[in-house]
């Protein structure tokens, strides 16, 4: 798991520019894809489910998934998830990039955004969210991909 404080050259789906605000959470998870026998769509569903599970620890109301890769609260984007595969040295890797708006809402044209702080009126330790995300993915990802086979 790689964590970034700030992204200066991030990108979103279809190569769009990814806007990142300092104080929010930006994480990349890496998996050897040779060991994963799921479609990208199945992996998208699993990763969205796990991030939604994380957010539900802090926000107790409805969280929606908007295809292909966003999580919304009150019709506003709180999280984006980008997945891609790369080939290196005869191995395929899955990279899952996750951006969660913890304390700031990026300004995206014609796309309302929100952040966890504005929703719950309480600052949450970014370190705690990082550790919770790591714990959820370590404990649940493997069991979920094995169920899908």
Predicted regions located by residue number:
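General beta-strand structural signal in soluble alpha/beta enzymes
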Residues: 4, 63-67
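Flexible, acidic active-site loops/lids enriched in D/E/S/T/G that coordinate Mg2+ and/or position polar
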Residues: 1-9, 13, 17
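Gly/Ser/Thr-rich helix-start
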Residues: 11-16, 24, 81, 98-100
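DPxDG-like acidic metal-binding loop motif
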Residues: 13-35, 43-44
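Long, positively charged amphipathic alpha-helical accessory segments at protein N-termini or as interdomain linkers
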Residues: 35-36, 41-63, 73-149
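Short, histidine-centered active-site or binding-site loop motifs used for metal coordination
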Residues: 6, 31-33, 120
